[in-house]
């Protein structure tokens, strides 16, 4: 799990080098994962566990939006989570 989210952080930092306003922090990636999970009506057990873990983190309210490539990487991670 950490490896896929690290990949999203690398994509975000590349976007920052190209002019995006957000450097990228782990809470940004976690907040994006939680936002994606909120769109699902039916979650598998792994997705349910991740959603519960992320909902407990109060610091996610300070997260900033990710670049599109990083959002796509997080979305791919969440959808393929088993």
UniProtKB/Swiss-Prot annotation:
Site (Interaction with holin): 42
Gene Ontology MF annotations: molecular function inhibitor activity; molecular sequestering activity
Transmembrane segments: none
InterPro entries: Linr3
Cross-referenced HAMAP family: Linr3_BPT4
Family designation: Belongs to the T4likevirus lysis inhibition accessory protein rIII family.
Subunit description: Homooligomer. Interacts with holin (via N-terminus).
Role description: Probably binds to the cytoplasmic part of the holin during lysis inhibition and stabilizes the holin-antiholin complex thereby resulting in a robust block of the hole formation.
Name of the protein in its database record: Lysis inhibition accessory protein
Species this chain originates from: Enterobacteria phage T4 (Bacteriophage T4)
Gene name linked to the record: rIII
């Amino acid at each position: 799990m950490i490896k896929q989210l690290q990949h999203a952080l690398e994509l975000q930092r590349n976007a920052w080098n190209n002019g995006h306003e957000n450097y990228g922090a782990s809470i940004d990636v976690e907040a994006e994962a939680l936002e994606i999970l909120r769109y699902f009506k039916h979650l598998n057990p792994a997705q349910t566990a991740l959603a519960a873990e992320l909902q407990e983190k109060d610091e996610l309210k300070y997260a900033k939006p990710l670049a599109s490539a990083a959002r796509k990487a997080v979305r791919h991670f969440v959808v393929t989570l088993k």
